[in-house]
Amino acid sequence: MSTFILGATGLVGSQIVKVAESSPAIKSITTLTRRTPDFANSSSKLKTLEESDSSKWSEIIKSQAVSSDVYLSAFGTTRAKAGSAENFKKIDYGINYSSAKAAKENGSKVCVLVSSMGANASSPFLYMKTKGELEDDIIKLGFDHTVILRPGALLGERKESHGLGNSIAQTIGNWTKGTWLQGLLKPIDASDVGKVAIDFAQKGINGELKDKVIIVGGDDLVKLANSLN
């Protein structure tokens, strides 16, 4: 099985790479990032592509001589990091959608998208609305299987700040994990999201998924992660 991973230097994406590297079922891993990742040359089955201009990513994906069986994306940003609502949508929706479309056109059969708890195209909140619109439009691309993961507060060490809101959510998530309060933020370790993402990727290629579209919310994501640990 071959995989293509977008957002591989982020909190969740880097964990997806780690799990993929350790999986004997995965024979090749391709990542596309803006800068040289820390894991470059960490595995013989890993190929890293670099392009600082993310608007060119879809063309790079389409130019790959051999398509990847599975396209996984944990790519995303925040309004604070993007600088404006317009830039946020251009990056979080635009780059994600064009890259997924390119992967589908290049022959990928399964798409695993790491989205967010509360994603809804009808939401009055920019972040949730954009995530929901992205989900809806990626589903319309018609992969053999589209798996959408909606984690709650992500736990783990970030290399870059994603803004005060994310920092607060992560701190509270750490405090509430394992208590009755965890139902509010549904905290989950990024490494566990990585495990679930790769598990779904493998099941999709192996013919073990019955549904064409699978959406996994925070509670179910935690349960699935626990079953894999």
UniProtKB/Swiss-Prot annotation:
Keyword annotations from UniProtKB, A to Z: Membrane, Mitochondrion, Mitochondrion outer membrane, Transit peptide
UniProt membrane topology term: Peripheral membrane protein
Localization: Mitochondrion outer membrane
Pfam families assigned to the protein according to its UniProt record, in alphabetical order: HIM1
This protein's record includes keyword Membrane: yes
UniProt KW Nucleotide-binding keyword: no
Transit peptide: 1-36
Coiled coil: none
UniProt family annotation: Belongs to the FMP52 family.
Protein name as catalogued: Protein FMP52, mitochondrial
Organism: Candida albicans (strain SC5314 / ATCC MYA-2876) (Yeast)
